[in-house]
Curated annotation (Swiss-Prot):
Region (Disordered): 434-530
Pfam families per record: DUF3490, Kinesin
Coiled-coil ranges from the UniProt annotation: 364-435
Compositional bias annotation for Polar residues: 498-523
Keyword field: ATP-binding, Coiled coil, Microtubule, Motor protein, Nucleotide-binding
Residues the record lists as binding ATP: 119-126
Protein name, as recorded: Kinesin-like protein KIN-7C
UniProt record, GO biological process: microtubule-based movement
Cellular component, GO, one term: microtubule
PROSITE patterns reported for this sequence: KINESIN_MOTOR_2 (PS50067)
Lineage, broadest ranks: Eukaryota, Viridiplantae, Streptophyta, Embryophyta, Tracheophyta
């Protein structure tokens, strides 16, 4: 059986009627109120002959007003508002199209519907209901003809309630029928005739039979007055046809009730007696019971509803606040003689519009589906009999135990990770404490004492000393450059060496390299065998001490020298340090940037061709650059002659710069170990054992730094796009250590600055001034941008899957913004961080992060050139841009 067709049935799908209930209702009920309409009839011929004025007037489409000034009941309201009001010139077609059509046609979608006509006698109830019934049936057949994919079966039945006796209008026998209550069917009429309709003409003939069978009589107010309540019921069953598929096996069943109530009347006005008086009494009694039920339902209380006070209310119980959509047409006479009856009708309608109904789609299983369902149920029961131990409670207990086991396994994994991290920290702490004492002991035994002239030690050749000094000096400069990111470069030690005409200056310069070499050798080989090597910062701290002791004497002598030559700084150092570290140098020239990390231990061999090392020439007492062009050599004396100094900067591309940093970090350990072993043998020391343990700690160190960076991102309100790029690019390789260290120190500086309530300097954040409030606002705007990108980047299915995955209700409002606000919020949950990065990458169009993106990320470490006038020089100020 196939799918349901039609726009009306699509609405049924939205109401949640996919789940079938055997013999009952399926889907979620739709809360609705009874729709109340008012139709004002024109004055009759008798009323016109008596010259009775029209006391009621429709002032708009929803309000009827009492316009007479006759002081009948001054406390009564003069205006009543309903869902729709039709004046006397409106036709029955308009009443149907604009009032009850939507309710009546709910029957083809599996929803029960009921249409009442309520009012005083001679107000036009039967006239209105006859036209509404014909228009409804015509539209139902028109709907059936347009939806041939479903098979429809229509059944018709008709009853009247005359003097509280139920009679079948389709039967020639005048036998009273009885009401029965059933748990599944509800209240039904026993032995009621139900005819299966062939076509529209067949139904017309049956309606004519009902009109002929109904009890009518003449009264003073009406020549042909209905003396009974008439209920016409049209049952519609629909199911998909077999040739459209076999997966659909449910049937929609609904009924439409057309209720023409007898009119209320006063005996004094109708001048009724005998039989007419008895009929009027039963009519008024049943209408009174109906009014009581409506009034109690409108109050919304849980009190008893007296449905059983009348057979009319018992039959219509599902339509009154039950499983049906209901519309009541209140017919009104505008004549002065019917003012009190008209007001009672309007009061009834005012109460009825407050009654709430719960209409549901009625889905019934077919025989085939029911048999299949019963077979499955039988198999399940037989299985339980064969295995009585496997009960539902036992299955629930097993599921709970499995959940506890998974939870404990997760906790054990986290505890193991914390244990490994604690052991690593303890090992580093013990190692650093032992190194302090061992360095002092080994320094007294193996250090080379320099003479008062600070000359070169005799046991070490000049070439080896120069090589070691350059190696350690460049290493020292690189780490100090990274530290300048935090301190702003105010406490940097600026050293300059120049050509001196006196031997004392030359010896002092040589002594500087000698002390550097000795300090590096002592720090490298002062460890017992079997321990892990000291960290890079501890090693360079030992190198820094002799520099500090010689800085004062060397600085005073070099400033007064007439042949001062500035040692070129590495390009990476100038890129990473701020401009403040050059502010203390009282000179008017610009330092040439022509060394590109030449002697860094992790420098690849092929990168040495970009710049050659500085060598000390003992014969000429000058510093020269081997293999370089003559245009790259300039002295302070030449600068005074020419009046300006040319800043010869050799900027490499961003891609080359990032590649160099990655390659240097990757081979840093192997290169350093080789240099340490060679230098150790040259002075008679044993090589360090256990050096290979150092790289093994990097995965744990990476996880630790990554977690700290993620928490600092959240604390400093860093851009989500920056977080995503950084998290996806650097995944724990040895070459990522430089990026991790720089990012961690930058974020720590921002956090400390925010905590003090100050604003980071331009040397750190570049050209952008930031604050916690500004960063939070930028982050909020970025989340709103990502929410807008979800509409563009994701399809409807992907968005719904994303809402479910991120715990956002599909019925809530601003779902995309809710998802965006949950990104990157759980800093302790690495899986949450990974999912956040994946979603942000998808929204910004990042499909597959590769080397190209790493080169783009290298821009973060490139210098920002801001022209700044410094005295008489045309220098450049460099700073690290901000990611905040």
């Amino acid at each position: 059986m196939g799918a349901i067709g039609g726009d009306e049935l699509v609405q049924w799908d939205k109401m949640g009627a996919a789940e079938a209930v055997n013999g009952g209702c399926g889907g979620a009920g739709k809360m609705d109120r009874i729709q109340v309409l008012v139709r004002l009839r024109p004055l009759s011929e008798k009323e016109v002959a008596r010259r009775e004025p029209a006391e009621w007037e429709c002032i708009n489409d929803s309000t009827v007003m009492f316009r007479s000034t006759f002081p009948d009941r001054p406390t009564a309201p003069t205006a009543y508002t309903f869902d729709r009001v039709f004046h006397s010139d409106c036709s029955t077609k308009e009443v149907y199209e604009e009032g009850v059509k939507e309710v009546a046609l709910s029957v083809v979608s599996g929803i029960n519907s009921s249409i009442f006509a309520y009012g005083q006698t001679s107000s036009g109830k039967t006239y209105t209901m006859t036209g509404v019934t014909e228009y409804t049936v015509a539209d139902i057949y028109d709907y059936i003809n347009k939806h041939e994919e479903r098979a429809f079966v229509l059944k018709f039945s008709a009853i009247e309630i005359y003097n509280e006796v139920i009679r079948d209008l389709l039967s020639a026998e005048n036998t009273p029928l009885r009401l029965w209550d059933d748990a599944e069917k509800g209240t039904y009429v026993e032995n009621l005739t139900e005819v299966v309709l062939r076509d529209w003409n067949h139904l017309k003939g049956l309606i004519s039979v009902c009109e002929a069978q109904r009890r009518t009589g003449e009264t003073f107010l009406n020549e042909k007055s209905s003396r009974s309540h008439q209920i016409l019921r049209l049952t519609v069953e629909s199911s998909a046809r077999e040739f459209l598929g076999k997966d659909k096996s449910t049937t929609l069943v609904a009924s439409a009730n057309f209720v023409d109530l007898a009119g209320s009347e006063r005996a004094s006005q109708a001048l009724s007696a005998g039989t007419r008086l008895k009929e009027g009494c039963h009519i008024n009694r049943s209408l009174l019971a109906l009014g009581t039920v409506i009034r109690k339902l409108s109050m919304g209380s849980n009190a008893h509803i007296p449905y059983r006070d009348s057979k009319l209310t018992r039959i219509l119980q599902p339509s009154l606040g039950g499983n049906a959509r209901t519309a009541i047409i209140c017919t009104l006479s505008p004549a002065t003689s019917h003012i009190e009856q008209s007001r009672n009708t309007l009061l009834f309608g005012s109460c009825a519009k407050e009654v709430v109904t719960n209409a549901q789609v009625n889905v019934v299983m077919s025989d085939k589906a029911l048999v299949k369902h019963l077979q499955k149920e039988l198999a399940r029961l037989e299985s339980e009999l064969r295995h009585p131990v496997q009960s539902s409670s036992l299955e629930t207990l097993l599921k709970e135990k499995d959940n506890q086991i998974r939870k404990m396994e997760k906790e054990i994994k986290e505890l193991k990770s914390q244990r490994d991290l604690a052991q690593s920290r303890l090992q580093d702490l013990l190692q650093s404490v032992g190194d302090h004492d061992l360095n002092r002991q080994v320094q007294g035994k193996h250090s080379v004492r320099s003479p008062p002239s600070v000359g070169m030690p005799p046991s070490v050749s000049r070439d080896d000393s120069s090589q070691v000094s350059h190696d350690d000096s460049d290493l020292y400069k690189e780490v100090r450059c990274i530290e300048s990111n935090r301190t702003g470069g105010n406490d940097q030690l600026d050293l300059s060496a120049g050509e001196s005409s006196s031997p004392q200056d030359s010896n002092m310069n040589s002594g500087l390299h000698g002390n550097d070499s000795n300090a590096s050798v002592n720090s490298r080989h002062s460890r017992p065998s079997g321990e892990a090597p000291i960290t890079l910062e501890e090693h360079l701290e030992n190198i820094r001490r002799p520099f500090v002791s010689l800085a004062k004497d060397l600085g005073s002598s070099t400033r007064n020298s007439s042949n001062l030559r500035v040692i070129g700084r590495s390009r990476s150092c100038r890129s990473l340090t701020g401009s403040t570290m050059f502010d203390d140098m009282e000179m008017d020239d610009c330092t040439p940037l022509n060394r590109s990390l030449v002697e860094f231990p992790g420098r690849p061999v092929e990168s040495h061709r970009r710049g050659s090392a500085l060598h000390y020439d003992a014969e000429t007492d000058t510093l020269s650059r081997a293999g370089s062009m003559s245009s790259e050599i300039s002295t302070f004396k030449d600068a005074k002659t020419n009046g300006s100094v040319a800043c010869d900067t050799e900027f490499t591309g961003i891609g080359e710069f990032v590649a160099e940093l990655k390659e240097m970090a990757q081979v840093h350990y192997q290169k350093q170990l080789g240099d340490q072993n060679a230098n150790g043998k040259s002075i008679g020391l044993d090589p360090i054992e256990g050096v290979s343990q150092s790289p093994s700690r990097w995965p744990l160190e990476f996880e630790k730094k990554q977690q700290e960076i993620i928490e600092l991102w959240q604390a400093c309100s860093i851009s989500l796009v920056h977080r995503t790029y950084f998290f996806l690019l650097f995944k724990g390789e040895a070459a990522d250590s430089i990026y991790m260290e720089v990012e961690l120190r930058r974020l720590s500086f921002l956090r400390d600055t925010y905590s003090r309530g100050s604003t980071p300097s331009n040397a750190i954040v570049g050209s952008l001034s930031t604050s916690p409030v500004a960063s939070a606002k930028k982050l909020q705007r970025e989340r709103e941008m990502l929410a807008r990108q979800m509409q563009k980047r994701l399809s409807t299915e992907e968005r719904e899957h994303t809402y479910t995955k991120w715990g956002v209700s599909l019925d809530s409002k601003r779902r995309k913004l809710q998802v965006a606000r949950r990104l990157w919020t759980e800093t302790k949950d690495l899986e949450h961080v990974r999912e956040s990065a994946s979603l942000v990458a998808k929204l910004i169009g990042l499909q597959e992060p590769g080397q190209v993106l790493k080169e783009m990320f290298g821009l973060s470490f490139a210098p920002q050139q801001q022209p700044t006038r410094r005295r008489s020089s045309n220098g450049w100020r460099y700073g690290i841009p901000s990611f905040a």
